[in-house]
Amino acid sequence: LAAARGALMAGATQMIVVSSVGAAAKSRNFYLRTKGETEDGLRALGFERLDILRPGLLMGDRAGPKRMGEGIAIAAAPLADALLHGSLRRYRSIPGETVARAIVALAGNAQPGVRIHENDAMRRLAD
């Protein structure tokens, strides 16, 4: 949040943040709770425009050490994605490149408000 405060003080009117599907400040899961608390903190700062991207599992090449749980999830993603329909579509995996393209598409959008973008919306923005 310190970087966001600094950006706001420097005159930024829009903030775009990558959070996570399932983010909620009251979640029992530490990761999702931290993401939710961060979202709430950003809302409280009062940017004219706040875009919160909530991707599922990010797919693509990564630098750094490989985590076992993440490796298992990446291997299982194609099968899991095929089974996730309807309201569960938001839990599907998504390429990191798609999320990056959505960010570029959102940058500079002057319409005020807080917008939540899940996988399907990010895919539309990236096209």
Task: For each feature predicted by the language model, list its residue ranges.
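Membrane-targeting and insertion segments and their boundary/processing signals
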Residues: 8, 12, 16, 70-77
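SDR active-site strand-loop-helix element
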Residues: 15-21, 53-55
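Glycine-rich NAD(P)-binding loop of the Rossmann-fold in SDR/ketoreductase-type enzymes
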Residues: 2, 21, 33
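NAD(P)-cofactor binding segment of oxidoreductase domains
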Residues: 1-15, 37, 41, 105-108
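Oxidoreductase cofactor-interface core, primarily capturing Rossmann-like NAD(P)-dependent enzymes
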Residues: 25-126
